[in-house]
């Protein structure tokens, strides 16, 4: 997954899910309709991605399956029931929001630490070793 996708989940997905889970009955009706559409889009998109990852034998297939089985249906359920949604669904949504935040922050940290930066001492060490080998070559001629 890319850094952009992690950042999207941290700064867009988490706040949206937390907002709906926390404010429940104070959320405008159009937000519930949006959750229904979003849930359906998530299910369809992740079914498509799951097929691709299945063919590639990707170890990340589980992410798509979680979205198909858990995230999408939960959003559709809350969206369709709007103000009549039971309390447990909002609590599960809150858990999903914090799980998404935690997982994506963790993955972002892992990916950022894997990025390799060029340090000045690495550049100078390479230059010093290459100039030393050139000097040895010229001295023996």
Model regions and ranges:
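Loop-to-transmembrane helix junctions at the membrane interface
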Residues: 52-66
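Canonical alpha-helical transmembrane segments
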Residues: 41-55, 76
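Membrane-helix boundary elements
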Residues: 10-33
